[in-house]
Amino acid sequence: MVGTPLFSNAKKILLLGSGELGKEVIIEAQRFGVECIAVDSYENAPAMQVAHRFHVIDMKDGGALRAVIEREKPDLIVPEIEAINTDTLKELETEGYHVVPTANATKLTMDREGIRRLAFEKLGLRTAKYEFAESLEELKEAVQRIGIPCVIKPIMSSSGKGQSTIKSERDIEKSWDYAKSAARGIGTKVIVEEFIKFDYEITLLTARTSEGTKFCEPIGHIQIDGDYHESWQPHPMCAPTKAKAQEMAKKITDELGGYGIFGVELFVLDDEVIFSEVSPRPHDTGMVTMVTQKMSEFEIHARAILGLPVNVDILFPGASHVIKSEILKWAPEYEIHEASKVKDTKIRLFGKPIAKVGRRMGVALAVSDDITKARENAEKAAHLVNIK
């Protein structure tokens, strides 16, 4: 049951992190009459622009996080990013607050060490070979054991920040410094992973709902330096490999528990499925579902956490391509007229208050009976957007 926003009977969602994914979640939640509060570390973040109200705090500060939650008393606490004091969330959960999907899932998935040990050591899922290192010397030893090339990532980071590929011994120190710079201020530990020459990688959006677990069609994607660049749906998979992917996704999401959508990232090599990462929230590669599915990943997430039925059917093949800034500027302006002329394509601008070089500022979405054509149109439209 939901009430009326801004009245005493309102159903309240408090969103921790107010980026472009959270913005879409709030839009979908508001369609059901949910009162939405957005929280982030800076003013005028995308989700704040559509929320009923917002707060600006350091979400890694447990005291500040507790204060805003106790003030708002939300029915649902919905993390949208990883840079949150998850120990405080676990405490609040024991006091009766509802964290989506669970506080433990939020804590595990913000920590590459925790989720990798869960996947490989507890659940027996196939992963890349890995080791952890807390110093430059430990990193050198780990690289020697894993072999070159290998991938290094901070255990606490997101969107490819701090991730690099070591291609020779000369890269080790540079990769170590880069990883430390992106570690969200929580330690210096890194994970060193075997470099897998996979055939392709997918995101399998997995919805845990009151009606059971449901899977969206696989989303193929390309990342550059660990950051989302383009995605398309559906990505073709043979039935046995798809079944393996769904089995793996169900194992990891069942262990994490709760309701909502999970972005399960998988590598596929010779029809074998290899676990990479999981996010207990909508996934950036899943933005393509805004034009491909009957319900986008954001509507699915909102419905699932509210206990409502979901539909994961695909309507059209389609693609998404990021719109990135090439400048540094407050309150940027966008020339979108030419981009809007591209056939069967839509432009979605996030409304970020500052443009930075390489920052995602929007996406171009395209549909077509031919995935290749959809990808071409999305890329064309994205590159026609002029940010100035």
From Swiss-Prot:
Residues reported in the UniProt entry to bind ATP: 112, 153, 158-163, 193-196, 201
Catalytic activity field: N(1)-(5-phospho-beta-D-ribosyl)glycinamide + formate + ATP = N(2)-formyl-N(1)-(5-phospho-beta-D-ribosyl)glycinamide + ADP + phosphate + H(+)
Keywords assigned: ATP-binding, Ligase, Magnesium, Metal-binding, Nucleotide-binding, Purine biosynthesis
Domain of life: Archaea
Any Gene Ontology biological process: 'de novo' IMP biosynthetic process
InterPro entries: ATP-grasp (IPR011761), ATP-grasp_carboxylate-amine (IPR003135), ATP_grasp_subdomain_1 (IPR013815), PreATP-grasp_dom_sf (IPR016185), PurT (IPR005862), PurT/PurK_preATP-grasp (IPR054350), PurT_C (IPR048740), Rudment_hybrid_motif (IPR011054)
Annotated residues for binding of N(1)-(5-phospho-beta-D-ribosyl)glycinamide: 20-21, 80, 284, 352, 359-360
A GO cellular component entry from the record: cytosol
Annotated ranges, domain ATP-grasp: 117-306
E.C. number: 6.3.1.21
GO molecular function list: ATP binding; magnesium ion binding; phosphoribosylglycinamide formyltransferase 2 activity; phosphoribosylglycinamide formyltransferase activity
Binding site for Mg(2+): 265, 277
Pathway(s) it belongs to: Purine metabolism; IMP biosynthesis via de novo pathway; N(2)-formyl-N(1)-(5-phospho-D-ribosyl)glycinamide from N(1)-(5-phospho-D-ribosyl)glycinamide (formate route): step 1/1
Entry annotated with the keyword Magnesium: yes
Subunit structure: Homodimer.
Function noted in UniProt: Involved in the de novo purine biosynthesis. Catalyzes the transfer of formate to 5-phospho-ribosyl-glycinamide (GAR), producing 5-phospho-ribosyl-N-formylglycinamide (FGAR). Formate is provided by PurU via hydrolysis of 10-formyl-tetrahydrofolate.
Annotated family: Belongs to the PurK/PurT family.
Protein name stated in the entry: Formate-dependent phosphoribosylglycinamide formyltransferase
Organism of provenance: Methanococcus maripaludis (strain C7 / ATCC BAA-1331)
Gene name as annotated: purT
